[in-house]
Every structure is written in C-alpha cells, then in structure tokens.
Amino acid sequence: MDYKKKENYKPETLILSYGYVPEWSEYALKPPIYQTSTFVFKSAKDGKKFFELAYGLREKEPSEQIGLIYSRLNNPNLEILEDRLTLYDEAEDCAVFSSGMSAISTTILTFLKPGDKIVYSTPLYGGTYYLFEHFLKSMDIKVLKFYLHENEDNVINLILREKPKIIYIETPTNPTLQMIDIEKFSKISKEINSILIVDNTFLGPIYQKPLKFGADIVIYSATKYICGHSDVVAGAVVGYKNYINEIKKTRTFLGTITDPINAWLLLRSLETLKIRFEKQTENAIKIAHFLKEHKNVKKVYYPLFSEGKQYEIYKKQCLGPGAMISFDINGNEETAFKFLDNLKVFKIAVSLGGTESLAEHPWSMTHSDIENSEKLKIGITESMIRLSIGIEDVQDLINDLKQALDKI
C-alpha cells in the first residue's frame, strides 16, 4: 500500500499503516521512536528551503516535501500520527499538541487578537471556561456566551449582531451531555464569516464527525478516547489545510507540540480506538438503563435518553451515544461523596476515555473553578456524578454502582 494512498480502504484498515513505509526504518513493521531533537540536512540549500516553508516565507510547491528540521517544528512520529488522525474525520490536515488545553489555546490564539470577539456555548470543560473567561478577557478579547436553554432566536441574533471571529461549541456538553446542532451553527458562521470550532472529545472521532456538518476546525483532548490507556497527555486539531497551516505556525513559536514518545504511544492507541470505543459504548448503554431504574437516581444524562429537539439533533449528527454518563443522585454533595467513596471497581478520578471506569464529582472537581451560581444555571448540581465507562465486565460495573447507590 502506498504510504499516502487511501484508495477505497476504510479508516480501520488505513489506521494500521497509513503514512509509513517499513523501508524507511530497516523494514521495521512499526515506526520506531525518533527520539532526536534535530535533523541533518543533506545540503545547506536544503536547510534554507526547509526553513522558508517552516516559517511561512513562501508557499510549498505542488510536488515539494516538507523537510525535517527540529522536533519543536516536526518529527517523523508526529507526522505519521497527524496523517492517521485525519482518517476518521476525513480531514485535510491535523496538528498534534502536548495536551488538549494546549490544542485549544494555540488554536484560539492563532485566530484572535485584542479587540476580536468569541462566542461560546455553555456548559463546557472547566479548563476551557477559565481560558475564555479569564485569560482571553485579560487580553482585551470580548468573550460572549450563550446557554442552551436560551431562546434560539436570541442566540442567533446575538451571533449575527456581534459577528464574532470564532464560534466555539462543545457537543455533547461536559458534563450535562446536551446536544448542539453543528449544522445550524455552521450556516450562521458562514453567513458572518466566522470560524466554527467544535470540541469533539466526548464522541469523536468514531461517533460524531463535525466536519461533515460544516465545522471548520475540530478539537480533541487526545488524552481521552484517542489514547484510551490513561498514560498520555496530548491534544489534536483536525480540519481544513488553510486553518491547520496557520495553527502549526503558532504551535512552532509557542512550543506546544507533543514529543516523539507520546506520538508513538498514540499511534499504538489509534489501532484499537474503534473496538475500544465500541465496547465502552456497549457497556455504557446497559449502565445508563440500569441507572435510570434505580430508586436513588433522580436523573440520567445520556444522549440516548435525549427528548424532543435534543433527540432529533442526536439522531441527525451522531452515530452512537458514546461512553460518558452523568446522573443526579437523591441528595447533596455529602451524599455524592458517600456514593463515590463506596465504589470499588470504579476509580475516583478525573479525565475520561480510558479502558478503566472512572467516577468524579463535577461540582467540586472538573468544574470547581466555575462560580456556584453559574454552575446551577448551566445544570451542574451538587448531587451530579460523571462516569467514564471502561471495558470491564459490564455486570461487575453495574454491581459496583448498585452496591454504592444502595448505601446512600
């Protein structure tokens, strides 16, 4: 198979070999780890040409290959990983980062300058909220948000009136798992020439493909499902080449690229991404149904249980409900903590998407930097628990949840 030839192969086939030729590395079946800080040029002229491209001093010629210079700019492991990360999303290009937050911050800083505007949906990940509400505001960037329970016409009018440079949405939302219509916001963004950015961490790249619905840029915390083993912190951005090229220039000077070892580990993880995520989702569906029937559970937040317009959006743009579940128990923070402390199989930890099942308390953990009044406004309560479902035996997981719920 040609290392960049896709033919009619599915992503599950391409993900094993795309972007790499064994002849490059003594016929090694898998890419080695290119643990080097710098690369040798064949000639001084090559060095000059490579830097011209790296620093955007000229456009790449059609048949020209971008050469290797220094691992802050590019590295073989990263280039192979970036090639493969385009497959599931059918993206033109990809940039990989040292964390999900570095992917978000580098992308935002690429396109916003003092005086610009950004509109974002809420709720969303607590770290992103802090970046927008504190860091961006300190740079004299106008930050506006909208709530999913707001009147739709009011939201549209806000965006059309303010004409933000960026519209940023996270769907499903973290931790309330509400759906946002990507296609609708794409139409609005194109009308005012905004950039639509979608955080697709909870469902992607298997169960939701935002580029197909008009997103310009898709962001991942690759730490989560893409890695799937809770042993790498990384981020990724996929999308159209014109946007990714600009993001890569910013990444070069901010130094937010990931390292060769993490890239190699992510290449390993990509090979099992789909089968892991399918098993996690299969488990999650059964667990969500169990929770819905338990007397000590007040409400379950899961895309499969969406109603009305929310369910319509889910059916239109999602290929499955994923493996994240949130629920409100009957009680308060003390009750929630008692439940968490009685878990045996589930681990009390933040993050998500790994092979092991995790449970956390958004009010006091992942979203603790959000004001309490704001948390209540966006649907985060003291009694909310967020679960990341792993690949364990599903009955063991259900039994664990049952015994902990029965003790509150």
Predicted feature residues:
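Conserved N-terminal alpha-helix of the aminotransferase class I/II PLP-enzyme fold
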Residues: 43-102, 127, 132-134
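Conserved C-terminal alpha-helix-loop-beta "cap" of PLP-dependent enzymes
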Residues: 299-385, 389
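A common structural junction motif
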Residues: 255, 343-351, 404-408
